[in-house]
Amino acid sequence: MSGTPRSRLSLYLDLIRWNRPAGWLVCLWPTLSALWVAADGFPGWHLLLVFVLGTCIMRSAGCCVNDVADRDFDRHVKRTAQRPVTTGAVGVKEALAVGAVLALLAFGLVLSTNAATIAWSVPALLVAIAYPYAKRLVSMPQTVLGIAFNFGIVLAFAAVQGRVPAVAWWLWLGTMFWVLAYDTEYAMVDRDDDLKIGIKTSAITLGRLDVAAIMLCYLLFLSLWVWALHSRALGALFYIAIAAALAQALWHWRLIRQRTRAGCFAAFRVNHWLGCTVFAGIAGSYLVRHLQSNG
């Protein structure tokens, strides 16, 4: 290992997981899907830019808070032992300052939308801050993560329509099951370490039912999205995308069924493609409809 000191920029990029995009991509695809549904098609460049940048920035801010909250646990977990806050390369106050700056940048983006979005951004921020501490209090902290990650859906409808209709909450609930699925896969990677240090996760709570529960969550996620959007008459592309997403879920079963660290981590890292597939089906369906109506 090189003894050359790392630059602050390098440490900050490591702190916010800049080189590991899977974490913000799983937040981004449901948010973009909600934007398209709320706008009944392309939402416009302004909102697209706000939500793409906002998702990336807030996920990065969340990493700062998470690493501060978990610093005493992370040093005992092989995967997280070298995180900047855990090693002391970035101080606690410094990490929180980075997170605060990022949160302010995200709020600046929200201010360019409307009053409803601004109002909903407050509970979104509070839940994001609360999640890292949920692992000490609840047996399924992934549900709290789901609430935090899924606020993008709520904010998308608020930004487009100025309200959050029932369909948004059905999509929110469906995506909750997706978060439970992929973050349980993630938790399975660290299960042995988490048992030793007393962290609560869905992988520990579910025990030998973990794989079955994950597959059920994938099924509920896709089923609820189909049910919520069936009245939108999105057409064949949407259902082809849902079928492709289901095929990916079955592939994940092959990756996680032996419960190996490598298999579970691989399943988590490619999960964003499942969300991307659903978004592609939705965006493609609206594009086809637009072309047909103007053809």
Swiss-Prot record:
Q: Which Pfam families match?
A: UbiA
Q: Which gene encodes it?
A: ubiA
Quote the cellular component terms of the Gene Ontology held in the record.
plasma membrane
- What protein does this entry describe? 4-hydroxybenzoate octaprenyltransferase
Which cofactors, by name?
A: Mg(2+)
The major lineage groups are: Bacteria, Pseudomonadati, Pseudomonadota, Betaproteobacteria, Burkholderiales
Q: Does the keyword Magnesium apply?
A: yes
Q: Which organism is it from?
A: Verminephrobacter eiseniae (strain EF01-2)
**Biological process terms in GO annotation:** ubiquinone biosynthetic process
What does the UniProt entry say about where the protein is found? Answer: Cell inner membrane
The UniProt family comment states: Belongs to the UbiA prenyltransferase family.
